Every structure is written in structure tokens, then in C-alpha cells.
Amino acid sequence: YHSIMETLRIVEKFVPELEIIVVNDGSKDNTKAEIERAIKQDSRVRMVSSEKNRGKGNAIIAGVSQVEGKYVAFVDADLELNPSQLEGYLKKMLDDNKDVVIGCKFLKDSKLDYPFKRKVISMGYYIMLLVLFHLNVKDTQTGLKVFRVEAIKPVAHLIRTSGFAYDIELLVAIHRRGFSIAQIPVEV
């Protein structure tokens, strides 16, 4: 509940017309009740709910299918990355005419501290994506991403991966269709 309302409070400052679609992917705790509480408080909040956990990919497909706006943003529910950073993502998208803007923890100006070992593993992962898919994206797993609806809606439901590799397959599909992808530093 608090992360939903906090996201609304932050994002409405720079995107006055917004909707928040929260996907409840079969949670067994009080998540559904908390989402319903947020819906009662603000009509811009909507819920897509599944009785059983179907994985991140299916949750994204369910959420994207309900989008009515021009842009789609992914924000992890734990708010590890502050949603206020989305303002910079939208600015980059509009100023540079990009179709997708994703956060990248491994850009020079990112403000975080990762162990050297993790950086080396991530670099190997990046090289693999570049060689196999010609995808020049250093960090596919960051919890903040913004898409133009015309870049994501036609492909979201075509992705076969239901787990966390969904992001990779989605970005590869978008890239192969000629849409542009930009990366922006993140702050944890």
C-alpha cells in the first residue's frame, strides 16, 4: 500500500495524468488487500490479479495488456530505485526521441556500490547479449524501465519466458523490431 501511494505521490508531480496498474501475482500475504485499499484511496490505481504465481513475465504481460496511456513504466514494488528517477527517463525519451529508456547500474554516473566480482559477472553477461543478440544493453534487470506503448504492447504477449529472463527476451524483441533503447544511470 505505502509503495503504491508513494509512487503516485512522486510521479504525479511530473506526470499528472497517470495510471498505476499493480499486478498481484498470486501473493499469499495481504498484498491483494493492500492493493484494494490503494484503489479505494485513488481511482488511478488498478489491479490485475492472479490466484497463483505465474512469474514475472506473465505478470508484465497481464499489466501491459491493461495499459491505456502512451507510456509504460516498470517500477519494482520494493522501491529499491526511487520512482522520482522516472522523470529523467521520460526527459531522455522525449529529448532524444527514444522508444525505451532503461536504468543501468553499470554506467559511470550510477550511484551505487557493487562488489568487483558482480561487476565482472555482469560484464560477461553484457558481452554475451552483445554477441548473441546484438543487444547493446549493459543491464537488463534494473527495476526501472520506460517504454513507448507502441514499442512494448505489440511484443509483450509474444514473449515465452515467464521468469526474470523475460526482460532480456522483451528487450531483444523490441530491438529486433527496430525500436531504439537508451540507458541512463541509476541511483540506489
Per-segment meaning from a language model:
Residues 136, 160-162, 171-187:
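Catalytic donor-sugar/metal-binding loop of nucleotide-sugar-dependent glycosyltransferases
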Residues 1-13:
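Short, well-formed alpha-helical segments that are part of the catalytic scaffolds
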Residues 81, 166-173:
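Short active-site alpha-helical segment characteristic of glycosyltransferases
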Residues 1, 24-33, 79:
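A conserved acidic beta->alpha catalytic loop
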Residues 70-78:
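Short beta-strand-to-loop acidic/aromatic patch adjacent to the donor-nucleotide binding site
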Residues 44, 50-66, 71, 83-164:
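Acceptor/aglycone-binding surface of glycosyltransferases and processive sugar-polymer synthases
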Residues 12-22, 30, 43-46:
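Short loop->beta transition adjacent to catalytic acidic/histidine clusters or analogous donor-positioning motifs
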